[in-house]
């Protein structure tokens, strides 16, 4: 408790923590050694000043050290968003993940229940019949047999129980909104990572660069979505071969029509699950288009497609052939066959 006070004192002066200081501070937080008052003061001091790249690297390092790991193929990918964009859209990354798995790229999907929308990845998967909350062996069996496994944040980041009530009571974004997508329990080095603000594109790419990321796109839609959007341009900061570059993409570059935000709105988990099943069944819609765009980006990241146009064609074939629907059926069967849910 007393060991934590110097970190608060430093932040109170407007100074930032070094990488080592941030790691030490978050190690104490994840060990449950910090009082609620200390935690609240610490998080808000950091938020008001603005979290630095070194502070995030230190926090991620501490969080990764305590996570319950999953063994996945080295070429596995995660399609994930920070959430918190406030738009309540359809579960784009979940549908995109199923499409990518059907294209032969292993997917180690990390997610949670809804934060700002009515239906998070875990919510819609449960509505589809997938058993979430599996332990590492259960997730590994799903990845082996279905090409995709879902890792529930609470199951694999048990240390987060020490911050759960403070996050709810603060009721505003903190550094923890950024940490989850940066701490995939399967240790993926390939990611399509959507963020709630364009300001975080470069910083998060720098964090992943420092922590061994190989090929990552950090993305934000011009409409505010934490995904590649089909309503207009999307901003991308890519990490590849150790180098970072930024560019803009449009749905037209992928051969897709433009949509409106209203077209992309989601509902409750059951509504979104029904729409997802329809999309997997080949129904043409704005949901299908935005999922194909994000799947195409993941296929480019995974070196399965040379560009977005080719990625969309490969993804559409996986949907229209029934392969993506078959992936979901396998995931449902394997997740329920395993009795190791936490």
Curated annotation (Swiss-Prot):
5-phospho-alpha-D-ribose 1-diphosphate binds at residues 81, 84-85, 89, 91-94, 109-117, 121. GO terms for biological process: L-tryptophan biosynthetic process. Its EC number is 2.4.2.18. Anthranilate 2 binds at residue 167. Pfam families: Glycos_trans_3N, Glycos_transf_3. It catalyses: N-(5-phospho-beta-D-ribosyl)anthranilate + diphosphate = 5-phospho-alpha-D-ribose 1-diphosphate + anthranilate. Its cofactor is Mg(2+). InterPro entries: Anthranilate_Pribosyl_Tfrase, Glycosyl_Trfase_fam3, Glycosyl_Trfase_fam3_N_dom, Glycosyl_Trfase_fam3_N_dom_sf, Nuc_phospho_transferase. One of its GO terms (cellular component) is cytosol. Mg(2+) 2 binds at residues 226-227. Anthranilate 1 binds at residues 81, 112. Pathway: Amino-acid biosynthesis; L-tryptophan biosynthesis; L-tryptophan from chorismate: step 2/5. Binds 2 magnesium ions per monomer. It comes from the Bacteria. Keywords: Amino-acid biosynthesis, Aromatic amino acid biosynthesis, Glycosyltransferase, Magnesium, Metal-binding, Transferase, Tryptophan biosynthesis. Gene3D superfamilies: Nucleoside phosphorylase/phosphoribosyltransferase catalytic domain (3.40.1030.10), Transferase, Pyrimidine Nucleoside Phosphorylase, Chain C (1.20.970.10). One of its GO terms (molecular function) is anthranilate phosphoribosyltransferase activity. Mg(2+) 1 binds at residues 93, 227. It is an enzyme of class 2 (transferase). Belongs to the anthranilate phosphoribosyltransferase family. Homodimer. Catalyzes the transfer of the phosphoribosyl group of 5-phosphorylribose-1-pyrophosphate (PRPP) to anthranilate to yield N-(5'-phosphoribosyl)-anthranilate (PRA). This is Anthranilate phosphoribosyltransferase. It comes from Beijerinckia indica subsp. indica (strain ATCC 9039 / DSM 1715 / NCIMB 8712).
């Amino acid at each position: 408790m007393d060991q934590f006070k110097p970190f608060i004192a430093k932040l109170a002066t407007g100074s930032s923590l070094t990488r080592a200081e941030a790691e030490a501070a978050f190690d104490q937080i994840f060990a449950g050694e910090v009082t609620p008052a200390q935690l609240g003061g610490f998080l808000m001091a950091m938020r008001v000043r603005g979290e630095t790249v070194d502070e995030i690297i230190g926090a991620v390092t501490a969080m990764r050290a305590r996570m319950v790991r999953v063994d996945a193929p080295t070429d596995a990918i995660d399609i994930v968003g920070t959430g918190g964009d406030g738009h309540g859209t359809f579960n784009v990354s979940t549908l995109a993940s199923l499409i990518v798995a059907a294209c032969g790229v292993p997917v180690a999907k990390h997610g949670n229940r809804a934060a700002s929308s009515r239906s998070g990845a875990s919510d819609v998967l449960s509505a589809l019949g997938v058993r979430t909350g599996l332990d590492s062996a259960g997730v590994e069996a799903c990845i082996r047999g279905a090409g995709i496994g879902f890792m529930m944040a609470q199951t694999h980041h048990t240390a987060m129980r020490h911050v759960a009530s403070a996050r709810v009571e603060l009721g505003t974004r903190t550094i923890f909104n950024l940490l989850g997508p940066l701490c995939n329990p399967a240790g993926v080095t390939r990611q399509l990572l959507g963020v709630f603000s364009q300001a975080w594109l470069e910083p998060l790419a720098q964090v992943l660069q420092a922590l061994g990321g190989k090929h990552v796109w950090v993305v934000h839609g011009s409409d505010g979505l934490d995904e590649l959007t089909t309503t207009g341009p999307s901003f991308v900061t890519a990490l590849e071969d150790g180098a970072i570059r930024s560019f803009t993409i449009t749905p037209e570059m992928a051969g897709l029509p433009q949509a409106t935000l209203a077209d992309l709105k989601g509902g409750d988990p059951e509504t979104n699950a029904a729409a997802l099943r329809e999309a997997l069944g080949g129904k043409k819609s704005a949901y299908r288009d935005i999922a194909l765009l994000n799947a195409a980006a993941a296929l480019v990241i995974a070196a399965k497609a040379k560009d977005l146009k080719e990625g969309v064609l490969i993804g559409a074939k996986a949907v229209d052939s029934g392969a993506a629907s078959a992936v979901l059926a396998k995931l449902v069967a394997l997740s329920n066959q395993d009795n190791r849910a936490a």
